[in-house]
Amino acid sequence: MEFFKDLKSDPIGKVASLQDERAIWIIMVVAMSGLVIVAHSLFQNYVYMAPCEQCVYIRFSMLVMALGGVIAAINPKNIILKIIGYVLGFYGAIIGMMYCIKLNSIHHAVHSEDPFGVQGCSAEPSFPFGLPLDMWAPDWFKPTGDCGYDNPIVPDDVSLSWLQQWFVDFYSEGWYLIPSLKFMNMAQACFIAYAVAFILLFAMFICWILKLKRA
């Protein structure tokens, strides 16, 4: 109750004060790294959904945001560390949305049988700054699937548990937020996650700047 009372009386000051605490930055770290871990450990390794080129780029951008949160959380009151956190956070969110838009267009082309729309999907990724992440951590960053096709492909020699079989059947038509309705594919869901993160970061950043001007 005290939080909402302070937010109502001085919204700019309250939002600005949040970023001086580690909690908000740790939330960003947990959220973004958590999504990557779920994508890798659950969907890739457990349900056998092979990641495509754009998928591993999305993982990269999420980890960039997580890194920004880690750096800012070291000392949130340190201006330099906070600026680095913001730069990495905004950068990760922006390129992440761009990757999502690209993946969504490929997904649409694949499922509409438009051969001219299926472009931008390679087995040899090119990460920003020339980082050879696919060589450093191939299980995490080497694309082994085709863009737009994210349905499970179970190896012939694998025996599935009943829970694995349930997941495989559940996502047999590909990853959707609501598979039975084919509602919101993975690219669209990730875009929303990035957009929400960007809006929150932007609001925090503006409130911080306004607070500095008050001082």
Curated annotation (Swiss-Prot):
This is Putative protein-disulfide oxidoreductase DsbI. Its main location: membrane. Disulfide bonds join 52-55, 121-147. GO terms for biological process: protein folding. Interacts with DsbL. It is found in: Cell inner membrane. It is a multi-pass membrane protein. Gene3D superfamilies: DsbB-like. GO terms for cellular component: plasma membrane. Keywords: Cell inner membrane, Cell membrane, Disulfide bond, Electron transport, Membrane, Oxidoreductase, Redox-active center, Transmembrane, Transmembrane helix, Transport. Belongs to the DsbB family. DsbI subfamily. Pfam families: DsbB. The chain crosses the membrane at residues 23-43, 56-75, 79-99, 190-210. GO terms for molecular function: protein-disulfide reductase activity. Required for disulfide bond formation in some proteins. Part of a redox system composed of DsbI and DsbL that mediates formation of an essential disulfide bond in AssT. It comes from the Bacteria. InterPro entries: DiS_bond_form_DsbB/BdbC, DsbB, DsbB-like_sf.
